[in-house]
Amino acid sequence: MPVSSSLAYKNYDYDYDSIQPYFYFDNDDEDFYHHQQGQTQPPAPSEDIWKKFELLPTPPLSPSRRQSLSTAEQLEMVSEFLGDDVVNQSFICDADYSQSFIKSIIIQDCMWSGFSAAAKLEKVVSEKLASLHAARKELISDSSSNRLNASYLQDLSTSASECIGPSVVFPYPLTESSKSSKVAPSEPMLVLDTPPNSSSSSGSDSEDEEEEEEEEEEEEEEEEEEEEIDVVTVEKRQKRNEAEVSDSRYPSPLVLKRCHVSTHQHNYAAHPSTRHDQPAVKRLRLESSSSNNSSSNRQGKQRKCTSPRTSDSEDNDKRRTHNVLERQRRNELKLSFFALRDEIPEVANNEKAAKVVILKKATECIHSMQLDEQRLLSIKEQLRRKSEQLKHRLQQLRSSH
């Protein structure tokens, strides 16, 4: 890469000499920038190509073709689109015109991002905005002095007074319905009394008010639903209590006879084979649970007598028996570990010894005991042989005498 092209990033005054050969080749008839000979070569890959376009002049801006509407035309358009507040505000005040004008002039493109072009664009935009504000002020003065506007406001006030009341639509007693009905007819007056220059703010205020009213109505409906639910539940509870009282006052003999049979049900939680083998604490728990079950059976005789025994109750009984057997197995395993710990001298006094430690110490103790056994057996064999030798010698001495 030549040195002259590398200096283009640091100083923009040398752009005419350093960048021109990459776009304008040597021509004797049209020599615009008086470039040097021998520099006609394509641009390097690392060269910033988009900076070259800053040297090109920007074309003149075309004038705006949009014409401003008169007051009568604006009022006619408002009367056509009276149902939609957003459309009314957009046609009366033309709030989005300045934004669309700015977006149409300032084009975000690398071809028009030069410093001189940006300055010209800012100047044109400021002039157009100033002329636009002046035209709007004239429209405000014309509309305030116009009689059509006053008659239109009168028509709106009469139409607002003829609106249907919310009590006709919502027959339920609402706490804040009067407040909402008072706020509703004053909305169009507030929207139209504001000048056209503040159309966006008035539109947003009206939308906010509508949203607040909708939220209030939803909250009121939710409160009504909650109140209705409370009333229904209270009535159901009262009916249920009355039914229970009537059943308790006038019990039938057939139901009492069947309940007497259901009191002798078998307790699946306590097996006769394993009841006496359980520890005292577990036995007390089972007895207390059985007493609680019997008391609950006595309290709810009618419901248990009328409803037959289902598969769910059988599953619960099976699960209960399984839990009892599992507790017994765990207790037996724990007791066996405690007994093994007491037999090992290294862990006998350690009550908090883990099961792994107990097993390791037990294996070590077994190996040591096996070695002692072999040693003692060898000593025993030696002593036996020695005793035999002594007996044989004793016999020899006796025979010699």
Curated annotation (Swiss-Prot):
Ranges for region Disordered: 177-251, 286-325
SMART domains (UniProt xref): HLH (SM00353)
bHLH domain: residues covered: 317-369
One Pfam family, short name: Myc-LZ
InterPro entries: bHLH_dom, HLH_DNA-bd_sf, Myc-LZ, Myc_transcription_factors, Tscrpt_reg_Myc, Tscrpt_reg_Myc_N
Biased composition (Low complexity): 288-297
TM helices/strands, residue ranges: none
Motif 9aaTAD: positions: 76-84
Location(s) in or outside the cell: Nucleus
Region of interest called Leucine-zipper, as start-end residue ranges on this chain: 376-397
Keywords assigned: Activator, DNA-binding, Glycoprotein, Nucleus, Transcription, Transcription regulation
UniProt biased composition (Acidic residues): 205-230
Protein name: Transcriptional regulator Myc-2
Lineage, top ranks: Eukaryota, Metazoa, Chordata, Craniata, Vertebrata
